[in-house]
């Protein structure tokens, strides 16, 4: 006896007419018969045919039967196939006609219908309920790729481990940074504010900031102090014209005000006079302090790049190397006048993104970073390319204060350990 499952594996799908013709020949040739218990209604079989459409007709295979006899027996045979269906149910279950006339019809042998038996040696025809469908591995790969694209990467709760830390202010941290984003526009200055300065230029500003970064490092001040110092300088210069000989004094007073706002231990005025090589007196410092506070309307509490940088590094799950490298890159941006066009949050996000690319050699800007930073990777690319160019010339430029600072053991020689992410600049072509 032939195993039906083995036949089904190697069986070539034949048209339904050939299968039934073979069935007819075998049933006439052999006398041994068996009952078919799994006969299905015409409508059920018709629905499971591959490419077939339902058509309510039955074609007699006997060659001598005329067309008129065939049409007259249609209704009888349909009724015999559905003996338990009432007339009302029959009306509700009318079959849908096919688009062609006889190409999709089901052929039924009258001898089969009378005897309903086949020989034991006859192999069972392939089941019509599960039609053969050719497997296409390429189609499955495409479907798997589409499914991977549709699956979004989960956003991590970066404050989960600080839930029991009262100093982390987990309950308010999201509200705090929402407020910072709303008010950071007041920290920004016009890109062309140097045009109203008659005696100073953007290069002089760069020299001043580079020198103040060294002073900040010598005094071992907090990072917040440095970013607030630069912010006070830019905001003041955007509103007040300053003579060249007073520019260094503006920088010293901005540092003094930032220390008073951020530091616990503040440098005394005499220390600032000394580091200026006594170019200014104590009276000059105090007088400029009054002018600067009056010009800025005593508004000192504005978000800078640093609080955003801390938050975004946390979202990136950074290690010490990433933190130091991101700080190095964002301090390079402080010196460059062209970077004042970008808001503090964008500069901070770009520093983290560029540091990731520099260390790993590829982008790691995931959904968690994008959610907490509110910037997509495409929004960072323009600023990122500028930052990479600053990194490329950091050690060879005229102003190397930031590079020298981060080339020390205190910062793990980070400035000399990693080359700039050149591939980010080359991708811009």
From Swiss-Prot:
Organism domain of life: Eukaryota
GO process terms (BP): cell division; mitotic cell cycle phase transition
InterPro entries named among the record's database cross-references: Cyclin (IPR039361), Cyclin-like_dom (IPR013763), Cyclin-like_sf (IPR036915), Cyclin_A/B-like (IPR046965), Cyclin_C-dom (IPR004367), Cyclin_N (IPR006671), Cyclins_cyclin-box (IPR048258)
GO molecular function, one term: cyclin-dependent protein serine/threonine kinase regulator activity
Signal peptide span: none
Region of interest (Disordered), residue spans: 66-98
Bias-annotated ranges (Basic and acidic residues): 68-80
Tissues where the protein occurs: Expressed in roots.
Keyword annotations from UniProtKB, A to Z: Cell cycle, Cell division, Cyclin
Family annotation (PANTHER family): CYCLINS
Subunit field text: Interacts with CDC20-1 and CDC20-2.
Protein family per UniProt: Belongs to the cyclin family. Cyclin AB subfamily.
Protein's name in the database: Cyclin-B2-2
Originating organism: Arabidopsis thaliana (Mouse-ear cress)
Lineage: Eukaryota, Viridiplantae, Streptophyta, Embryophyta, Tracheophyta
Gene it is expressed from: CYCB2-2
């Amino acid at each position: 006896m032939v195993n039906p499952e083995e036949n089904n594996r190697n069986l070539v799908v034949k048209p339904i007419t050939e299968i039934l013709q073979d069935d007819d020949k075998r049933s006439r040739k052999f006398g041994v018969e068996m009952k078919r218990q799994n006969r299905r209604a015409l409508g059920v079989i018709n629905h499971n045919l591959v490419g077939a459409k339902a058509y309510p007709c039955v074609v007699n295979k006997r060659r001598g039967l005329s067309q008129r006899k065939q049409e007259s027996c249609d209704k009888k045979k349909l009724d015999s196939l559905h003996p338990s269906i009432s007339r009302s149910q029959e009306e509700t279950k009318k079959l849908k006609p096919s688009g062609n006339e006889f190409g999709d019809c089901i052929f039924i042998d009258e001898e089969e219908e009378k005897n309903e038996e086949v020989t034991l040696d006859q192999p069972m025809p392939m089941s019509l309920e599960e039609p053969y469908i050719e497997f296409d591995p390429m189609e499955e790969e495409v479907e798997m790729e589409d499914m991977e694209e549709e699956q979004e990467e989960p956003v991590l709760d970066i404050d989960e481990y600080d839930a029991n830390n009262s100093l982390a202010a987990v309950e308010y941290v999201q509200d705090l940074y929402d407020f910072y984003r709303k008010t950071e526009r007041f920290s920004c200055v016009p890109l062309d504010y140097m045009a109203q300065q008659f005696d100073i230029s953007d290069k002089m500003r760069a020299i001043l900031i580079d020198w103040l970064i060294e002073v900040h490092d010598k005094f071992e001040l907090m990072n917040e102090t440095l970013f607030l110092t630069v912010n006070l300088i830019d905001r003041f210069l955007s509103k007040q014209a300053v003579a060249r000989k007073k520019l260094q004094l503006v920088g010293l007073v901005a540092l003094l005000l930032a220390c008073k706002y951020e530091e616990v231990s503040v440098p005394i005025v005499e220390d600032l006079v000394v580091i200026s090589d006594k170019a200014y007196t104590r009276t000059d410092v105090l007088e400029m302090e009054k002018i600067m506070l009056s010009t800025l309307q005593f508004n000192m509490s504005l978000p800078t790049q640093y609080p955003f940088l801390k938050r975004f590094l946390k979202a990136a799950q950074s290690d010490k190397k990433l933190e130091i490298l991101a700080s190095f890159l964002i301090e390079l941006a402080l010196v460059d006048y062209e970077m004042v066009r970008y808001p503090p949050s964008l500069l901070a996000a770009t520093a983290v993104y560029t540091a990731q690319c520099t260390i790993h050699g590829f982008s790691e800007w995931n959904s968690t970073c994008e959610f907490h930073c509110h910037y997509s990777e495409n929004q960072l690319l323009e600023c990122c390319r500028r930052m990479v160019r600053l990194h490329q010339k950091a050690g060879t430029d005229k102003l190397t204060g930031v590079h020298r600072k981060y080339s020390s053991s205190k910062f793990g020689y980070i400035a000399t350990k990693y080359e700039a992410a050149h591939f980010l600049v080359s991708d811009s072509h």
